[in-house]
Amino acid sequence: MQGSLNSELTSLGKSQATKLATKLASLNLDKIFSSTATRASQTANLIFDDQPIIHSDDLQEIAMGNWEGKTYTQIKTESPKEWFNFFKDPFSYTPSKGGESFDDLEKRLKKFIDHEQIKSMTGHIAIVSHRITLKMLISILQQDKALFNHIDLDPTSLSILTLANDASKIACLNDTTHY
């Protein structure tokens, strides 16, 4: 589990980001946001080259506490109930020591949305972040907490939401046709 561990982007991640950059080359963006995690920042830099990027700690992946750095098998063996809740009933998940609950993540992302005035922005923005964080962000913008359990996002996938009048519409979700 990575969680909030700071790691470098893998060679596969670099390849996927470069391919996504080609796909998005003609898109004019008004703002680009990225998690401050090294792997997300490297992804954003590969995709958006010399464009200015606003880094935010609020876009970090959910903190996994003492699960970070362990394998799925280790965690499932040590904490079977919490492992189940994490994947099947995330809002009942109690984080390990130093970890973050899904409610905490939701509050953090709502703070980001409010601080950056995401809902009232016009134009095109990009957000480079992490799987669980992006799933939560999409659920918040869709105003559908239950949606979190029904979407999955692959690494370096493309999702597009259209925001208007304090509502959002999913135009594209988890597009990986660029790789």
Spans of model-derived segments:
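Loop-to-helix element that buttresses phosphate recognition and phosphoryl-transfer chemistry
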Residues: 1-43, 97-110
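Short amphipathic alpha-helical/adjacent loop interface patches that line ligand
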Residues: 17, 79, 90, 109-113, ...
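Acidic, low-complexity terminal tails and accessory targeting/binding regions
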Residues: 49, 56, 62-74, 118-123, ...
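Short glycine/proline- and acidic residue-enriched helix-loop micro-motifs
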Residues: 82-104
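Generic beta-sheet signal
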Residues: 121-131
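Catalytic DNA-binding helix-loop module of base-excision-repair DNA glycosylases/AP lyases
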Residues: 133-139
